[in-house]
Amino acid sequence: MRKSPLALLLSLICLISSHNEIQAQGHPPTDSLRQRAAASVGKEKHDLLMRIAMSTNDIADWDATLNDAIDRCDTPAICRSRLNRIQCLFNFYSVDSAIIEARESLPFILNAKQYSFYFSTYNTFISGLFKQRRFDEAREEATTMFETAQQGLTR
């Protein structure tokens, strides 16, 4: 069955107007998550804050997850929040800021023995150096990361 160009055009107009109407509504799922987070406590609140931050990639939302983890003295959540914030900076904001923050966060994450977050943060840090074409520094940092991993495996 062949559709007329007019029918296709009308379908496209309806689709675009539906999309625009949805966009005009803001982020209803995020708004409801914010309401639930405001009424929640503990890990449940933190998980909701993480979902909000992942959906918006707004640095203020990542700050909220980090501050919540700090308030709860939850070291793994602090490390995860720092990593996610750094990756958000790297992907959506400033690579310079991501590099600075990663450099500052690495000792804390290593001392906390959160190795998965540590090596993910280090990898993001090195990727930032590559993105800035700082190849020699990236190579040196990759060597340092490898040596750190070897020391952890031989202990």
Task: Name these PLM-found stretches.
Residues M1-S4:
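Positively charged n-region of N-terminal signal peptides that target proteins for export
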Residues I22-R155:
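A "functional boundary" signal
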Residues L6-A7, L49:
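Short amphipathic alpha-helical "recognition" segments used for binding
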Residues A7-S17:
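Bacterial N-terminal signal peptides
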